[in-house]
């Protein structure tokens, strides 16, 4: 416990929280040739490798993910949500923050329906999260 005189000399410092998606918080300045701090909601990237991974202990599946080089030069591992995808090496994708709880080291999601990542086919509910268009009604 601090005394009053100790607190007068030096006040309590507030804890600084670490960002959960650090690769989205900076960009490469071409003119100055160095990284500059500015946050982005999403960043564009190119797929380097598209493969599968098994989740942590109680769960069992083959989760699809991609290794992506972002526009700021950093490489991240991003999850591909939804059933089925058409991504392959050199595909352009949009990456947003958001971790996958049962995949260690995966802190980003690929946005479906943007750039080369097509929307999920035959999806009726929760379409906006998977980039699906409203299906045509039959007469």
UniProtKB/Swiss-Prot annotation:
Species lineage: Bacteria, Bacillati, Mycoplasmatota, Mollicutes, Acholeplasmatales
Region (Disordered): 1-21
Ranges in coiled-coil conformation: none
Pfam families: Ribosom_S12_S23 (PF00164)
Listed GO CC annotations: small ribosomal subunit
Protein name per its UniProtKB record: Small ribosomal subunit protein uS12
HAMAP family: Ribosomal_uS12_B (MF_00403_B)
Modification 3-methylthioaspartic acid, positions: 102
Biased composition, class Basic residues, residue ranges: 8-18
